[in-house]
């Protein structure tokens, strides 16, 4: 190779390659088949539902941050910081592929030993239903235990919980919006059968919604 040709080769190898724009780089790594999964719609509820089912955790036990699902993106976003000094007594989330009258997935409070990071999912067993009215609208909560926690997995009904535990849950939901001047009413806890019925109803409502969407 001549000296002139060698110098040209060196110059071309040292010249910086054009860097594609960010959106071009992102699009080049994605296809229509590799869109990020949506935790509400893409995660299955589980073969044992409505008895045992998957739960996507939104809020960690002991947190003052009110996280919630962003229904458009599927990401977990910060909704607000609680106005009072209370913290969530247990992990809180939703059941995938369910739908309630407020157009949200069904809410669940999961009792277990440890806090779980927002965005993770776990298997839970329904043990009861907490009927609740939030600012005049129905906003019932499923009370569940982690099906893979050795301390809680044997619970099958809410009557097996200590009265103090039930009072702790009730008081949290009665008080956590008081400083926002928002009224919440909690009715008597209902047994596991009522929880199973509520979950099944929300599963059916979600299925109807999907069929209606496909027919459009």
Swiss-Prot record:
Entry annotated with the keyword Ribosomal protein: no
Biased segments, Acidic residues type: 1-10
A single BP term in Gene Ontology: phosphate-containing compound metabolic process
GO cellular component, one term: cytosol
Predominant localisation class: cytoplasm
Pfam families membership: Pyrophosphatase (PF00719)
Cofactor requirement: Mg(2+)
Catalytic site: 88 (proton donor)
Binding site for Mg(2+) 2: 107
Protein name: Soluble inorganic pyrophosphatase 3
Domain of life: Eukaryota
Residues that hold substrate according to the record: 66, 80, 92, 176
PROSITE patterns documented for this protein: PPASE (PS00387)
Keywords: Cytoplasm, Hydrolase, Magnesium, Metal-binding
Residue ranges of the region described as Disordered: 1-21
Location relative to the cell: Cytoplasm
Tissues expressed in: Expressed preferentially in stamen, pollen and flower, and at a low level in lateral roots and root elongation zones.
Similarity-based family: Belongs to the PPase family.
Residues that bind Mg(2+) 1: 102, 107, 139
Molecular function via GO: inorganic diphosphate phosphatase activity; magnesium ion binding
PANTHER family: INORGANIC PYROPHOSPHATASE (PTHR10286)
EC number(s) on file: 3.6.1.1
